[in-house]
């Protein structure tokens, strides 16, 4: 195999002790395997290895060899990743099931081509890149992987060898935490080098083969961006960072336009169009490097000129190079002057504290109208009335409290970004831990108090815990009945986005109950939206593993029933998922197409097929309830937190320097479950190779049906429901990736042995 061929190059690299490491490593692997089979402790396995194969090594030399093992294996994994990336188009059928070509042909066979065309005109996939700390590779290593995969694809042995040498000399450990701006720059690389090309390639295909280009106003793909905007639990994200990030996003997309226009200028060398392309190139160049020189610069100017060039080519030059011009036009429609929309996010509890601070200012009445003098003493109902009507121009500088200043400045930053990058530059504000109608209206009021009477902003509540998901319908109905907010929604084309958190939902209620609660919340909110004549979009906060909403994402969206509004698919893509699923042009195009087609398939090609019958719905509910009970009992076990603190990698997450934000929410010295972030929580179970959040409770629940003699109900549900099958497949993925032999020695631990057995018994179910 290619891996074995290129892996052999490691032996030729000019590194100290490389031969010794490569000779000892296979022996160490065999020792570990035997040790696992015998349920030995890790320290005993390592000790037996040195006693047998290197008895003369002192402690220092033993540590050096173990460290060399880690370095060697890390680089082997990088090589494997690069080979996998290079062969992506061979391993995956780029025109097979789930691709646009396949969807187009299936629609034609079912005589649904026109229906498909009309649906794509309004269907949209929104990919939101986040800086959640799940990417352990430093940026320079990611670049090497990219270069290495390109060299492997070309079988360029000389470049491969040089890159392996570079890899050997490049540290994998970050000495310092990245800043929020560092995280932003890291993810902008993917926008510039991957999404810019892959998304426009898909847009070109749709415009050429499915919908006439002139009729396609829908962008199909939107890209969101959280680094530099997500303040939830990250005190290092300031308004200055937000503005700096937005500026960098615009610079990056203009640089890509400039590169494309330079290439186009070499092709458009004939009268009528030549000078227009040259002028456009100069215009973008000036905006990049001399922005003060441009008296007029806007997306409309760029698009109008490009469309004029296109008309000239078609009418006067037989359409020569029109596909190149259309490609740039499509890119401009996709990415505008903003590249990606910079979302702002903050916790509702922070907002409440800030709002209390705002209205408590002794001179507040001189800055606002509609604020009752005794606002804080009012009943909840009266406060809601006041929140809807108050407005003003409150300066952030009149407050000494830093978080109050920063919150108000972040709203001003959104206004500033919209002026420079266009409205899409920053027009979404997410309220995490949203529990009440007041949580939403407090933010609405803060925007109107920031000299923004009619804010061009989508206010997006994020419902995360099981109780919050259950109350989401009541909260949103109160919002839709508010006349001022209703007028705001009309200005937003009567479209409301709601975010649903898979990670914290799973942490709170367990895998099955979280997914089922989110499904039910989507159904309830869809029905509510239909009742009020509103279009509802669901924004899913998903991570990489099934325990955080990951797994087979395409299958998940393809399994949605007609009871859920689905003109949009919106989801977060985090950390390592970005590089693994969207790290190359091939993988990015493939996975974007899969997402696009999954929404189309459930709505156009198989309408009604995924709807749950009353009997199946009852079975789902019973499975969820029993799994929830099992998970809650597990969480309440007195050893739950101590086990994570002392037997897992949880305490070390804060030391990895892979993210800018603190590793836990609260400031308490002791670990509280409520303060525990979903990523270190899920990650710690994953590194124990136990993957508890992805399966715990599911086995107990199904066993309950077996004990009651009702397993046929579960079998019938499995046969009928694609959603249920998807949930089980993803949970089985968590089970498959578990390896309890690694921690079997814990069974003998006096303090934690019984708790380990409890987990293992659930795994065996």
Task: Give, region by region, the residue ranges found by the protein language model.
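Acidic, glycine-enriched catalytic cores built around paired aspartates
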Residues: 1-39, 43-65, 86-89, 94-97, ...
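Conserved structured core elements
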Residues: 157, 185, 189, 193-196, ...
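Glycine- and acidic
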Residues: 172-189, 239, 291-293, 308-315, ...
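Conserved alpha/beta core surface patches that mediate binding of polyanionic ligands
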Residues: 208-223, 409, 440-445, 474-486, ...
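Catalytic or ion-translocation cores adjacent to nucleophile or general acid/base/metal-coordination motifs
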Residues: 239-265, 450-626
């Amino acid at each position: 195999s290619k891996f074995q061929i290129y892996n052999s190059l490691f032996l030729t690299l000019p590194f100290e002790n490389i031969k010794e490491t490569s000779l000892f490593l296979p022996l160490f692997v065999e020792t570990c395997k035997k040790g696992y089979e015998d349920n030995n402790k890790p320290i005993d396995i390592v000790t037996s290895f040195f006693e047998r194969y290197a008895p003369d090594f002192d402690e220092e030399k033993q540590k050096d060899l173990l460290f060399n093992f880690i370095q060697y294996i890390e680089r082997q994994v990088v090589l494997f990743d690069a080979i996998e990336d290079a062969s992506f188009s061979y391993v995956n059928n780029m025109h097979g099931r789930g691709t646009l070509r396949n969807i187009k042909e299936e629609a034609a066979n079912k005589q649904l081509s026109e229906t498909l065309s009309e649906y794509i005109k309004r269907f949209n996939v929104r990919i939101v890149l986040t800086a959640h700390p799940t990417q352990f590779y430093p940026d320079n290593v990611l670049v090497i992987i990219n270069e290495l995969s390109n060299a492997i694809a070309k079988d360029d042995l000389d470049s491969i060898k040089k890159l392996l040498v570079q890899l050997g000399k490049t540290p994998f450990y970050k000495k310092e935490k990245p800043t929020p701006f560092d995280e932003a720059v890291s993810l902008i690389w993917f926008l510039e080098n991957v999404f810019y090309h892959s998304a426009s390639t898909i847009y070109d295909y749709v415009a050429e083969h499915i919908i006439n280009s002139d009729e396609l106003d829908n962008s199909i793909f939107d890209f969101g961006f959280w680094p530099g905007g997500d303040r939830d639990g990250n005190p290092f994200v300031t308004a200055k960072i937000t503005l700096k990030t937005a500026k960098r996003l615009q610079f990056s997309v203009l640089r890509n336009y400039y590169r494309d226009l330079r290439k186009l200028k070499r092709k458009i060398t004939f009268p009528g169009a030549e000078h227009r392309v040259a002028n456009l190139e100069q215009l973008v160049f000036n905006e990049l490097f001399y922005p003060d020189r441009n008296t007029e610069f806007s997306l409309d100017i760029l698009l109008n000129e490009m469309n004029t060039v296109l008309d000239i080519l078609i009418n006067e030059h037989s359409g020569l190079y029109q596909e190149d011009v259309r490609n740039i036009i499509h890119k401009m429609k996709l990415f505008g002057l903003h590249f990606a929309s910079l979302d702002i996010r903050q916790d509702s509890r922070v907002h409440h504290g800030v709002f209390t601070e705002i209205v408590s200012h002794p001179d507040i009445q001189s800055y606002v109208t509609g604020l009752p003098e005794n606002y804080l003493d009012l009943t909840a109902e009266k406060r809601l009335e006041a929140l809807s009507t108050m407005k003003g121009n409150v300066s952030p500088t009149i407050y000494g409290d830093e978080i109050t200043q920063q919150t108000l400045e972040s709203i001003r930053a959104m206004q500033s970004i919209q002026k420079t990058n266009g409205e899409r530059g920053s027009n979404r504000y997410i309220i995490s831990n949203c529990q009440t109608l007041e949580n939403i209206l407090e933010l609405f009021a803060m925007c109107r108090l920031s000299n923004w009477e009619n804010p061009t902003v989508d206010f997006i509540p994020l419902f995360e815990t099981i109780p919050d998901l259950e109350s989401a319908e009541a909260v949103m109905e109160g919002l839709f009945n508010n006349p001022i907010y209703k007028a705001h929604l009309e200005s937003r084309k009567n479209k409301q986005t709601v975010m649903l958190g898979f990670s914290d939902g799973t942490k709170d209620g367990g895998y099955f109950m979280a997914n089922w609660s989110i499904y039910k919340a989507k159904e309830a909110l869809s029905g509510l939206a239909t009742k009020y004549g509103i279009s509802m979009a669901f924004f899913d906060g998903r991570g990489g593993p099934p325990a955080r909403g990951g797994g087979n994402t395409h299958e998940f969206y393809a399994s949605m029933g007609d009871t859920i509004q689905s003109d949009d698919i919106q989801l977060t893509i985090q950390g390592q998922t970005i590089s693994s699923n969207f790290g190359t042009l091939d993988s990015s195009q493939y996975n974007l197409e899969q997402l696009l087609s999954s929404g189309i398939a459930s709505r156009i090609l198989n309408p009604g097929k995924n709807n749950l019958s009353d009997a199946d719905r009852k079975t789902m509910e019973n499975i969820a309830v029993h799994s929830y009970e099992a998970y809650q009992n597990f969480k309440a076990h007195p050893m739950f937190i101590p086990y994570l603190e002392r037997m897992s990698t949880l305490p070390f997450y804060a030391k990895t320097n892979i993210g800018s934000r603190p590793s836990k929410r609260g400031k308490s010295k002791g670990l509280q479950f409520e303060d525990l972030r979903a990523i270190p929580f899920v990650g710690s179970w994953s590194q124990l190779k136990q993957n508890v959040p992805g399966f715990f409770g599911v086995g107990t629940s199904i066993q309950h049906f077996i004990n009651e003699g009702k397993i046929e109900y579960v079998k019938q549900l499995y046969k009928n429901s694609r959603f249920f099958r998807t949930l089980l497949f993803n949970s089985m993925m968590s089970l498959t990736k578990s390896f309890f032999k690694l921690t079997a020695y814990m069974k003998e631990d006096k303090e934690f042995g019984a708790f380990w057995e409890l987990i293992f018994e659930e795994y065996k179910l």
